[in-house]
Amino acid sequence: MTINAQNFLTTARTLLLGLWLTIIPNLVRADKFTMKTGEIYVGHAEREGVIAGAYDGVKRTLFRATRMASQEPGAGSSAWESFKLIQPRKTNFVSNQMPTILTGMTAEAWDEFGRRKVRYSPPRNVAKTVELTQALIELGPKASKVRGVETYWSSQVSTSIIPRNVIVGLLNRIPKEEKDERLRVVRFYLQAGWFTEAKAAVSALKADFPEFNDVLNNAAAGIYDAELTELMVRWKGQLKGGTPVSVIRPELEKTLKTAEGASAAVRASGLEMLDLINATDELRSRRLRELKAAFDGSRQGNLNAGPGPQYLAEMIEALSKCPEIAEPFFAPFDQYLRNPDGVSPKKAWSIALSAWSGGLGLATDDISVALAYAEAYETITKAAHSPDQADRSKFANRLESLQIPGPEGDRPLSAHEAQTITERVRPLNTLSDDTKNRTLTYRVENDTNSTPTEYLATVPPGYHRLGQWPAIIVLNPGGDPDKAAVAWRREAAERGWIVLAPDLKSTGPYHFSTDEHATVTLCLRDALKRLAINPDRVFVAGGLGGGDMAWDYALAHPDSLAGGIVLSGLPAKYVPPYRANTQMVPLFIVEGELAPGEPQVVMPLVKTLMQKNWDATYVQYQKRGYEFFEEEIPTIFDWASGRRRKVDVDEFQAVAAREGDQRFYGLIISEFATGRSLAPESVNTLGENLKPATLAAKFAGTANQIQITSDGIKALDIWISPRQIDFTKRMDIKLGGRSRFKGMPKVDWNSFLDDLASRGDTRQTYFMKVEIR
C-alpha cells in the first residue's frame, strides 16, 4: 500500500530481532572491527592496500589495518526495520545532478510531514543562496534516506539527528487495524533504543488487540530486557568514569522495581549488579575503618607519625567522593593488611601515606621515608599553586634541603621521586555540588595580556578535585564559545568528561595566528591548575572553522594533547607542512563527501597519514557537505576513551614554522633561522611556500644520552626530565653528532617549580635547562 506521507506509510519489510513475530528478515551483511585502542566499528568491509574501512550505509570509517585487534566477518550483520514514505514532488521537478560541492549548509527544523528547508551556497558564488525542500523517503532506526521535493537530491542522515517526535508522529499515521505494521513499529523503536516509545506502542496494541496479549507480553518483556541491559552498560560506564555510587544505586533500584516485565535472567543480572555495588560499598566502608585504625594505631605511644589528620581526611574524602579513581592507590595498603604474619599499624599507615602522596612506586613501610615523601608532596602542591616567585623560591629551598632516610644514611630527594610525587598533585579548590550542573566562567590567573583571557568549563556530575578527569577543549574561532560547547556537554557529562571552551575573542574566520593558539594554551594551563584534569587525556576539538583550528593546533602542540578531533576542518596553511607531527598526536577527522576539497585535498592527505602508520581515523559521510556532524560525537568519545598522550617517548621527529609552535617534549626552539618561520598572512593556502624547521631527538636511556638533529634552528633550549635521563649518572647531549653538554645533571628546584606553576602539567616536569646557541 503506497500513500502520500500526509496520510499513510508503506513499508520495506525488514526485521532485527524477530522476538514475537516470525518474518524472514532482509539481512544487511556487516563485519565487526575491534581496534587495539578499544573502539568498535561495524559495516561492510572495504580495503585499499594497508587502509581498511567499514561502510554502514551512511558513513565510511577508514583506518590503518594494522591498528585492528580483530575483524569478525558477519558479526555486525543486522536486519533493520524500515518504513518507506511517499513524498510529493513539485510539478516542475528538476531531475538534474546533485551539487558536487556543498558549502554554507543550513537547515530548518523538520516539520510533521518529515520535510525541512535547506540552504546552501554554490562554491563559485558563495554570496548566492540556494533553497530547496528535503523530504524523508525512508525511515530506519539508524539511518534514514532523504530526497528533494523540487529537484533531485538523494542523501541519507543519521536517524539520531531527526527529532524523535517527528518520527513518532509519522509512524503514528499507520491505521490502528494494521497490527503487523504496528508490531514492526515496536521493533523499529527497539532497534533505535527508544524504549519509552516501544513500551507505549505495545500498550496501545494490547488495548486494540487484547486477543494477542500473550504475544504482546513477550514483546514487552523483550523491551524491558533490552532497556535494562542498556542501562546497566551505561551505569557501569558511569561508575568507571567516576559517577558516585550514591547517584547510580537509586536509579538501579527504581528501575528494578518498575521493570517487572523483564525476564528473570535480565532481572537477575540487575540484582547481581546491585549486590556488587552494595558489596563494594561495604568493602569501601571497611577500608575506611582500617585506614583510620592504622592512623590511630601509628600514633599510640607518642610515635612520631608526623602529618596525619589532614592526609587522613584527604584520603577519606577521595575514597568517599571518587573511589574508582582513588582506590588503586590503596592496593599496597590492602595487600599489607592481609599479611598472614601480622600487621603493624605504623607500617600500615606508612604504606597508605607514602602511596597516597607519592604513588604506588614509592609505597614504603618505613614511616620516616613516608613522612619525607608527604612533606615533599605538601611542598610541591603549595608551590604549584603559588603565583609568587619569591614564595616558590622558599619552597625550592625546602625541597633542596629535604633529606630522605635510608639504610646508608640520609640522601637528597631525587628528581625521579619528585616527578612521581608531582603526579599526585591535585587542585586546592573544591567545587560545590550545585556548580557541577552549571557552566562556569574562568579568567586565566596571572594573565599579563591587556585583554583578559577567559574560558568556560563544565564538569561532570561525579567531579571531585581529588580525582582525575579527561577533558575536551572545544574551539569556535569568531563565534560564541558556549554555543560551540553545547553539542559536546551531554555526552561528556554521561561519560565523565570536562568540557573547556576558550573565548578566542576573534572575529571572522580562523586566522591561524599565534594569538589564537596562545589563548588556547593559556586556558589549558590555567584549567590544569584549577580543575582535576588528567593531563594525559586532553583533546582539542572543533567543527567547521573550529575544525580548521583543531587540526592546526593539534599538529602545532602535539606533546600537550592526547588527540585532535576535526569536524569538517580544512587542512590549510600550516597543516599540510606539519603533517609529520601526526606521528605524535592521534587525529579523528570527519568530512562530508561533498565538502570543498574533500576528494582533492582532505582524503588524499589523510590516506598518506595512514600509509605511514600514523594514528589517523577518517570518517566520510556520504552525499553530505560542509557540516558539523553532531551525530558523530558519541563515536568520537569512544575513539578518545582509548587514547592517552605520549609522555615517555624514546624519540620523535617534529617540524615547526610559526612563532609559538616551539615546544616538543622539553626541546624548545628559542630562535628560528631566517626564513624558516612565517606569519600566517604570508603563508599560502596549502603552505607551499613554507620551509619548516625540523627537530628530531632520540633519548638513549642506556647511554644516558640525548641525540639531537635539527635544521633551520638558531637557538635551542633543552629541558631535562627524569623520564628520559637518569639524574644519578653522567649525561651527554649531542647536537648533530657533537657533544654540547657532558657531565652530571644537576636538579634546579627553582626552575622545576616555576615551570610547574606556569604550565600546570604534572606529568611533564623538567628539572634542568641546557641552552644551545
Language-model-detected regions and their locations in the chain:
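Short beta-strand/loop motif that positions the catalytic acidic residue
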Residues: 588-591
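Gly/Ser-rich "nucleophile elbow"/oxyanion-hole loop immediately N-terminal to the catalytic nucleophile
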Residues: 461-467, 511-544, 556, 560
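Primarily recognizes the serine-hydrolase "nucleophile elbow" in alpha/beta-hydrolase
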Residues: 536-583
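C-terminal catalytic histidine-bearing segment of alpha/beta-hydrolase fold enzymes
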Residues: 596-704, 711-712
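A domain-start/cap signature at the N-terminus of enzymes
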Residues: 284-468, 744, 751-761
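Compositionally biased alpha-helical segments
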Residues: 30-317, 748-772
